[in-house]
C-alpha cells in the first residue's frame, strides 16, 4: 500500500523540474518575440523615412591593406623624377572650374579670379593590384609623389586656400592615373584697351604652363568640357558683364626651350549705366544750361558772364572726375572726346557773349547822325514834308513797323573792321544796307548773334551726338 504513495510522491518530485524547464522555455520565447514586436513598431513609425534610403553593401577594406598599398607604392619611389622620364613626354590633362571673377581693377589693369584647378596624368610607378579601385588621399600625400610644376604666367599674385585645411585633393587609381586639384585665388594681369571707354570690351587671359619642363618633357592638353563656370550672378564684376570664354593652346619659344602654354580668355563687356549717370547726363545738361544765356538780354552783363563762367568751371570739374576711374593713358578715350566737345560748346557760348558785348559796347554812330550833331542848323531845319496817307490802316502799320526797324538798324550800324583781310571777307551792315555789297563777302549782323546761336548751337550739338553714338555703338 505504501508503494503507490512513493511513486506518486516520486512523480511529483520528478515533475517539478520538468515544469520549471517548460516555464523557462516560454519566458525565453516571449523575450525573443518582444524585440521583434518593438522593432516592428519602430519600423512602422519610421517607414516613410527609411523608404527613401538606398542601402549599398560595400566590402569592408581593412585599414592595414591601404597602409600596405601606400607603403609598397612609396618604397623606392623618387618624387624628383617625372613619369616616363627618358621615354616619352608626360601628358597632363587640365581642367578648371571658375568659382568667381572680379572685381576688375582698370587702374592697375588686373582682375581677380577664384578657381578650382585640376591636373590628371599617368604614373606607372603608382600602379597597384587590389580590390580597391581608387585611393582617396588628403594633402599630406601630395609632397610624397611627383607633381607638375605648373605656374600661371600672367599672375601678379596667387594664394592657395589653407582654411581649415589645405584645399588640395589627391586621387590615385589602380592603373596609375593621378588626379590632383587645388583651389587658388589669382590676381592676373589684363591689358585693357581703353580707346572705346566706356563702351569697351575686353578679353582677359589666364595663362599657365610648366615652369621648367619644355614640350619635350611635358605636354598639356585640355579635357573635354575643360572649363566650367559657376552661377555668374554671384560674381563681383560691378561695371562689367560676363559674355563668354574660350580656351587655346599654343607654343611659346624662349631661350630655355619651347613651352606649351594653355590660355583661357574671359570676355567681358563694360556696363555704361554708371558712366551715363555720372558723366554723360551731367555734361549734356551743362551744355544745355549754357544755351540759356542766348535768351538773356545782352545788356545783363553780370547774369550772362556768371552763367558762362559757372558752366565752364563745372565742365572742368566733371572732366577731372571722369578721369579718376581711368589709368593715365596717353591716348584719347571715347569719354575724353565727349567731355572735350562739351567743354568746347560751353566755352564757345561764353566767347559768343564776349564777342557780342564787345561790338555792342563799342559801336559808332552812323554818318548821318554825325553830320547832324556837327551842324546844329541841319538839326533845327530838318523836317519831313507833310504827306497825306490814303492807304489802308494795315499798310500804314506795316510802313510804320518798317520805319521802326530801319531806325533800329541805323542804331546798330557798325563801322567796318580795320584791316584788308577783314574787309575782303566781311562787310558791315551799314555798307551792305546801302548797297555797298561786294562779291565774296559775308553779311553778318552782330546784333543778331544771339538769334544765330539759338539755332546753331543746339543743331551742332545734336549732330555731334548722332555721329558720336552711332560711331561707337554700331561701327
Swiss-Prot record:
Pfam families: Neur_chan_LBD (PF02931), Neur_chan_memb (PF02932). Keywords: Cell membrane, Cell projection, Chloride, Chloride channel, Cytoplasmic vesicle, Disulfide bond, Glycoprotein, Ion channel, Ion transport, Lipoprotein, Membrane, Palmitate, Phosphoprotein, Postsynaptic cell membrane, Signal, Synapse, Transmembrane, Transmembrane helix, Transport. Allosterically activated by benzodiazepines. Activated by pentobarbital. Inhibited by the antagonist bicuculline. Inhibited by zinc ions. Potentiated by histamine. GO terms for molecular function: chloride channel activity; GABA-A receptor activity; GABA-gated chloride ion channel activity. GO terms for cellular component: chloride channel complex; cytoplasmic vesicle membrane; dendrite membrane; GABA-A receptor complex; plasma membrane; postsynapse; postsynaptic specialization membrane. CDD domains: LGIC_ECD_GABAAR_G, LGIC_TM_GABAAR_gamma. Residues 41-275, 323-334, 473-475 are extracellular. The chain crosses the membrane at residues 276-296, 303-322, 335-359, 452-472. Glycans are attached at residues 52, 129, 247. Residues 297-302, 360-451 are cytoplasmic. It catalyses: chloride(in) = chloride(out). GO terms for biological process: cellular response to histamine; chloride transmembrane transport; gamma-aminobutyric acid signaling pathway; inhibitory synapse assembly; synaptic transmission, GABAergic. Residues 1-39 form the signal peptide. Its main location: membrane. Disulfide bonds join 190-204. It is found in: Postsynaptic cell membrane; Cell membrane; Cell projection, Dendrite; Cytoplasmic vesicle membrane. Palmitoylated by ZDHHC3/GODZ; required for the accumulation of GABA(A) receptors at the postsynaptic membrane of inhibitory GABAergic synapses. Glycosylated. It is a multi-pass membrane protein. It comes from the Eukaryota. The modification Phosphoserine is found at residue 382. NCBIfam families: LIC. Heteropentamer, formed by a combination of alpha (GABRA1-6), beta (GABRB1-3), gamma (GABRG1-3), delta (GABRD), epsilon (GABRE), rho (GABRR1-3), pi (GABRP) and theta (GABRQ) chains, each subunit exhibiting distinct physiological and pharmacological properties. Interacts with GABARAP. Interacts with KIF21B. Identified in a complex of 720 kDa composed of LHFPL4, NLGN2, GABRA1, GABRB2, GABRG2 and GABRB3. Interacts with LHFPL4. Interacts with SHISA7; interaction leads to the regulation of GABA(A) receptor trafficking, channel deactivation kinetics and pharmacology. The extracellular domain contributes to synaptic contact formation. Gamma subunit of the heteropentameric ligand-gated chloride channel gated by gamma-aminobutyric acid (GABA), a major inhibitory neurotransmitter in the brain. GABA-gated chloride channels, also named GABA(A) receptors (GABAAR), consist of five subunits arranged around a central pore and contain GABA active binding site(s) located at the alpha and beta subunit interface(s). When activated by GABA, GABAARs selectively allow the flow of chloride anions across the cell membrane down their electrochemical gradient. This is Gamma-aminobutyric acid receptor subunit gamma-2. The lineage of its organism: Eukaryota, Metazoa, Chordata, Craniata, Vertebrata. The gene is GABRG2.
